[in-house]
Amino acid sequence: MTVGISVEKGKQDTPPLELHYLGDKVLRQKAKRIAKVDDEIRTLAKEMLQTMYSSQGIGLAAPQVGVNKRLIVIDTDPENPANAPLVLINPEIKKFGQQLCPFEEGCLSIPGVHLDVIRPDEIEVSYRDEQGKPKRIKASGLLSRVIQHEIDHLDGVMFVDRVENEIALSSQLKQRGFALKSVQRIA
């Protein structure tokens, strides 16, 4: 579950990758599976981690940096140097828990917008690590939520698509200069 990629946890003056924001078509595409885990993928994962830390995030999906690949990086405790980040390549949720929980989410691709989203509290996920080895983890709480949020990005879904409170959604998007028409409601 730990990552073998060494990255300093901290803000860089110039993050290596550029974030894309709500309204950008790249965020609405279904990302492509990664056929081979190689140095190019490991470099992308490292740069994604550096970008995530520089942006003060706890998760980042490749489409958020304009890369159409099924790769996510996560660190739910970025202030703790002992907590290793996760790199999940071709992640797939195999099982959802029965208990649903509302929790406030935000997104590096929609800065300043924070709204409640209801998601399963527990999941089981299969993926490949940065060496290409198959892995499977059970996650609950914050880790479960971040994995689900980032996998949504890989499928062209953004957290605002899942927000049920339309009044709060419209208000926050407008305050931050985002268009409500960029939201694609999940039925």
Swiss-Prot record:
Entry EC number(s): 3.5.1.88
Annotated signal peptide: none
Example GO biological process: co-translational protein modification
UniProt keyword list: Hydrolase, Iron, Metal-binding, Protein biosynthesis
Cofactor or coenzyme needed: Fe(2+)
A Pfam family: Pep_deformylase
Molecular function GO labels: metal ion binding; peptide deformylase activity
Reactions it catalyzes: N-terminal N-formyl-L-methionyl-[peptide] + H2O = N-terminal L-methionyl-[peptide] + formate
Cofactor binding, per record: Binds 1 Fe(2+) ion.
Enzyme class of the recorded protein, top EC level: hydrolase
Matching Gene3D superfamilies: Peptide deformylase (3.90.45.10)
Residues reported to bind Fe cation: C107, H149, H153
SUPFAM superfamilies tied to this protein: Peptide deformylase
InterPro entries: Peptide_deformylase (IPR023635), Peptide_deformylase_sf (IPR036821)
Superkingdom in the source lineage: Bacteria
Active site: E150
Family from the record: Belongs to the polypeptide deformylase family.
Function: Removes the formyl group from the N-terminal Met of newly synthesized proteins. Requires at least a dipeptide for an efficient rate of reaction. N-terminal L-methionine is a prerequisite for activity but the enzyme has broad specificity at other positions.
PANTHER family assigned to the protein according to its UniProt record, in alphabetical order: PEPTIDE DEFORMYLASE (PTHR10458:SF22)
Protein name listed in UniProt: Peptide deformylase
